[in-house]
Design a protein with these regions (language model features):
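Hydrophobic transmembrane alpha-helices and immediately adjacent juxtamembrane helices
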Residues: 1-278
C-alpha cells in the first residue's frame, strides 16, 4: 500500500506577516515552550509559583515605605494598592522583554536542529509573563476588596479599561521583545543592555509615582510616548475615580503599534540567519 508522504514547503516570510496560520499549526509546540519556561523558572524552589506573587509584593512593600516616607502622592489610593496595581502590569512588560531578549540564545540547540516558526519563542516568553500576572492579579483582587471603602471602584469602567491596558502592554512587550530577541542573537552585548533598559523604562513609567509630580507643561504628553504610561494609568482608572485623556491613550497606543511593527519587521528580516548565529 502506497502512502503519499506529507510535504511541508518552507517559504520566505513577508516581513510584516505574523504567520498566524503557521503558528496555529505549531500551537502545541508554542504551549510546550510556554509551559516548559514556567516549570523551569520555578523548578527547585521551595515556594514554587508563589514567587509570582511574592516578587511584586516585596517590591510593593519597599516602594510603599519609600513613598510614605518621602510623601509621594498616590492619587487618593492607599500606597500599597497604588504601587501593587502598577507592578502587576509592569511585571508583564519587564519579564516579557527580559525573557524574550534572551530567548533565541536559550533555545539555540532547538533552532539549529529543527524548523518551526521562530516567532513562537518570543510569544512563549510573553505567555509566561502573562501567567505570572494572573497569579499576582489574584492578590490585587484581594487588596481591592480589603480597601473597598477607600477606593472608587466602578465595575463597568474597570471591565472596559482593563482589557485596553492589557492589550497595550502585550503589544508593546511583544514588539520590544521580538526586536531584542533578534538583536541579542546577533549582538550579544544586548544581554547586558536589556536590564538597564528595563530599569530606565520603569522610572519613566508611573509605577511608584503619579503623573502629578511633574509640573512642567506637556510632561504627560512626553511620558505618553512610553506605552506603559497609558497602560498603567488606564489600569488604575477603574478604581481611582480618575479619567485619562483620550489623546494620551492614542499617543501610547500609536507608539505601542509602532514598536510592534518595528519588532516584527526586524525579526522577520533577520530570522533566516538565526540558525547560523545561535
Amino acid at each position: 500500500m502506497y502512502i503519499c508522504p506529507v510535504e511541508y514547503e518552507i517559504k520566505p516570510h513577508q516581513k510584516l506577516n505574523l504567520g498566524l496560520k503557521e503558528i496555529w499549526l505549531f500551537r502545541e509546540m508554542l504551549f510546550f515552550f510556554a509551559w516548559r519556561d514556567i516549570k523551569v523558572k520555578y523548578k527547585q524552589t521551595v515556594l514554587g509559583f508563589l514567587w509570582a506573587i511574592l516578587q511584586p509584593l516585596l517590591l510593593m512593600s519597599i516602594f510603599s515605605l519609600a513613598g510614605s516616607a518621602l510623601n509621594i502622592p498616590s492619587e487618593s489610593l492607599p500606597h500599597p494598592l497604588f504601587t501593587y496595581s502598577a507592578l502587576t502590569l509592569w511585571m508583564i512588560f519587564s519579564t516579557g522583554i527580559s525573557n524574550a531578549g534572551n530567548s533565541m540564545i536559550s533555545n539555540a540547540n532547538i533552532i539549529r536542529k529543527i524548523y518551526f516558526p521562530r516567532l513562537i519563542i518570543p510569544i512563549s516568553s510573553v505567555l509566561t509573563a502573562l501567567f505570572d500576572f494572573l497569579m499576582a492579579f489574584i492578590i490585587l483582587i484581594g487588596m481591592m476588596i480589603f480597601y473597598h471603602d477607600r477606593i472608587k471602584f466602578e465595575l463597568d469602567k474597570f471591565l472596559l479599561l482593563f482589557p485596553v491596558s492589557i492589550i497595550i502592554t502585550v503589544i508593546s512587550t511583544f514588539g520590544i521583545g521580538s526586536l531584542l530577541a533578534a538583536l541579542t542573537i546577533k549582538y550579544r552585548d544586548f544581554r547586558y543592555v536589556t536590564p538597564f533598559l528595563v530599569q530606565f523604562l520603569m522610572f519613566v513609567t508611573p509605577v511608584i509615582y503619579p503623573i502629578s509630580v511633574f509640573h512642567f507643561t506637556g510632561s504627560k504628553y512626553l511620558l505618553a510616548i512610553n506605552p506603559m504610561y497609558s497602560a498603567v494609568e488606564l489600569f488604575r482608572s477603574g478604581f481611582n475615580g480618575q479619567i485619562l485623556e483620550l489623546r494620551l491613550v492614542a499617543i501610547s497606543l500609536f507608539f505601542a503599534v509602532m514598536l510592534f511593527i518595528v519588532g516584527i519587521y526586524y525579526f522577520r528580516k533577520t530570522e533566516a540567519d538565526f540558525a547560523d548565529l545561535a
